[in-house]
Amino acid sequence: MKNIQHHYNFVVVGGGLAGICAAVTAARNGIRTALVQDRPVLGGNSSKEIRVPPVGATQCNFAYSRETGLIEELFLNNLYNNPTWSPEGWNLELESIVRNEPNIDLFLNCAVSEVKTVKYDRYNPECQNLKVVSVKAYCAMAETWHIFKAPFFADCSGDGIVGSGAGAFFKYGIEAASEYNEPFCPEESKMETMGMSLQLKARDTGRPIPFKKPKWIDFELNEADFGPYRPVNEHFFPDTGGFWWLEWGGELDTVHDTIQIKDEVQKITIAVWDYLKNRSPLAEKLITYELDWLGAVPGKRESRRFLGDHVLTMGDISEQFHFEDAVAYGGWGFDHHPAGGFHDKINPSTHHYLRGPHNIPLRSLYSKNIVNLFFAGRNISASHYALSSTRVMLTCAQLGEAVGMAAFNAIKYKCLIKNLLEAEKMKAIQQDLFKADHHIHGYNTTLSNDISSMATVNASSEFRGENLGETWGTEPLTEDRMQLLTIVSNYIDYIKVRLDAEENTVLSYAFFQGPANASTFPEKELFRSKVEVKKGKNQRIDLPVLCEIINKGWHFLIFDANPDINLYIVESPPGLLRYYPRPFDPIRPNQFSKWTLRSLQIGQQKAADADGAMVAAPSWNRFAYENKNISTFLNFSFDCVVHPLQMVYESKMILNPHSRPTNMPNLWVSEKTSFKDSEWISLTWEKPREIERIQIIFDSSLQFHFSQSWQGYSVHAIPTIVKEYKILACMADGTENEIIHVKNNYKRNCLHETNIKNVLTIKLLCFATHGIERAQVYSLRILEKSGNTTFS
């Protein structure tokens, strides 16, 4: 046996999305980091071994909530390099983002087996807190023991191997309702968790392929075994999976009984394929299909939850509690899975939608009694039902990024984790996260060395909301429809709507105010009326809206169903968005809104939305089919123009502290253009400045959320992102210098080191996008020279 001892500033155990984001974030800030993973690949539940598609905060109740920061960088890299979204390509992206960082050493196939601790204050007999000194991991492939020493550790392992070995306090199972006043919990606590799943993938071989169930699968499934809540014949996607509900094991110990649980879930999964292939209504269609891949590693949902100085609860999430130490956000609903899994004939999941995004405090991301141990992922300090929301992978990625930044600041300030709660240090963490394009819901963070707000802003043009461009087709008002609008005036006179009328008819409509918490659903009715519409094509009808605007921001126009009316569909900037009603679903109840968004699939007879509903597709026109490839990512609305015109896309919007829609779009948008001449925006100061860095945040269509199955896309980049741009610096001596010229950008967050002096004006010129005919920019941050911190 070989023994190797390693010394680092920060050791991250667990190579899922939380661990990757923690390690990369720390490393990019100069921290020498080890990433220790017990599997041969990175990615955790999203890896090619398990293949659970990552999901997060993007929900119909708050449309523009996709996670940004490091996970957005990963997704945009993956789209560019791996547009087919293959699991192999995804794993290559994950490994590349780690191996490309010079401050990270990656240790794959290294399983932690021992954690060494010491008493933190050995001179104080009353102090029971411990400190992790080292973790020991074994690599069987190389017959080598690795001992990792560091001042700080992060347990991102899911089950919490470091926390458990260190003696960190933890909880397991479902609390009683009275413990945290959580109404969904049982009266008495239970030692039950959510179970584990295996995925499978089938492929069409083009010739008949038989399947015979192995003898060791000692049961056979038929239609009745699926019950009313697992309509496998309706929701089976042979090429991409769709088997999250093949779940079991929550009544066992999801740590120590993992092998037993995996064996049973494997039996269930193969038995399901046997039914689909040989006896189901799909059997004839699946004659030429074979089982292409079957997961051998179960995807886990829940096991240990380690106690921090705050336990996140249902109330914190549903009430959107304000935390001074907020470092990340979530938005997935309370998604509880019954412990019995597949063998329970009840709902495989009950998903209660949230009113709005919620924040997660740093106090839930470290151990209460281990002074140098962070947690990120599904093992954080949260109640069982709170975890049913925060456990999803894109939220876990946000937690990892926050922990990586907290570790950087703990080392910078040479302090304990708990000392980071001091106001100055917490502000530094939040600013560092903001700089990394990491979002904290409801926080108006600015960078201390950002001088953009001191400048005068000018632009080549500003989108006024009148010219929405080509129509993509029409949508019949066979059901109610809704339009999101952004209102910034104190009143409005009317809304001009483009439509066709098959007969003389009456169009009824209502105007609503949205919630104050940035959610995108109607809450308070302000006006209701109706207008007569004459038979005719391509009409622009004025809808009077006679009301005072109390709260500026999101408002909603609801069209009552009228089968004689067809509304025109256009592509639009953020802040204009169309919705349709979703039938009540007992598995996925939404107490706040009946409205949801449609994920457009041009050419299909039905379009599936992000929440699983199926509705008839619009009548797409020739222009739509010509632009089908980019349509999936675009922001679509009905052709509605508010009067007086709402100037919500002005150049000054790049100075606001938000780099995403909140209750406003918060971005500069140019007028429609062919880009024959560049669209530009500039910042000018009264006196010369010394500029260290320039950061641009482009629009990457945050209303879109990447597929919940491993399907591919027909483009390599988000169509709203500026593809080619140039930065010019106008100097105090009257000269003009080109600072940077990027010809094939596909990223949202673009940071450029400049180190230039005597600058009076910075000008961003946009020459092309990846599809749309406008330039759309959230932020242009100009960062003055500040002190750099390095670590040895």
Predicted regions: what they are:
Residues 4-16:
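Beta1/beta-strand and adjacent pyrophosphate-binding region of the FAD-binding site
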Residues 7, 25, 31-32, 37-129, ...:
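Conserved N-terminal/central alpha/beta ligand/cofactor-binding core
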